[in-house]
């Protein structure tokens, strides 16, 4: 396995797919990186030369990926919660932050159903 940005990318996959194993790099970013590094998207990771791997590593180092990106996202959410913005309050309560309705669904964010006992007749 080749190591790029602290992540072991799979040897058998095409480079464009293997790069998406790095947190913060999707298909589009992977394609841009490979175009900049002059590497074919169809090349398998095992077929890359050390020179090509070095160029890819150099370009990926310019991106905010893995731990740095996770830290930035968490700090952004924490900042929203501290300033008590609407989005921050929704994060704090564990509810959807992007305007979805919560009357019926949103079970993923709200967690399992908390049943309320019925009133006896």
Swiss-Prot record:
Residues 91-121 are annotated as: Disordered. Pfam families: Ribosomal_S13 (PF00416). One of its GO terms (biological process) is translation. InterPro entries: Rbsml_uS13_C, Ribosomal_uS13, Ribosomal_uS13-like_H2TH, Ribosomal_uS13_bac-type, Ribosomal_uS13_CS. Gene3D superfamilies: 1.10.8.50, 30s ribosomal protein s13, domain 2. Keywords: Ribonucleoprotein, Ribosomal protein, RNA-binding, rRNA-binding, tRNA-binding. GO terms for molecular function: rRNA binding; structural constituent of ribosome; tRNA binding. The keyword Ribonucleoprotein applies. Residues 106-121 have a biased composition (Basic residues). Disulfide bonds: none annotated. GO terms for cellular component: cytosol; small ribosomal subunit. Located at the top of the head of the 30S subunit, it contacts several helices of the 16S rRNA. In the 70S ribosome it contacts the 23S rRNA (bridge B1a) and protein L5 of the 50S subunit (bridge B1b), connecting the 2 subunits; these bridges are implicated in subunit movement. Contacts the tRNAs in the A and P-sites. Part of the 30S ribosomal subunit. Forms a loose heterodimer with protein S19. Forms two bridges to the 50S subunit in the 70S ribosome. PANTHER family: 30S RIBOSOMAL PROTEIN S13/40S RIBOSOMAL PROTEIN S18, SMALL RIBOSOMAL SUBUNIT PROTEIN US13M. Belongs to the universal ribosomal protein uS13 family. This is Small ribosomal subunit protein uS13. The gene is rpsM.
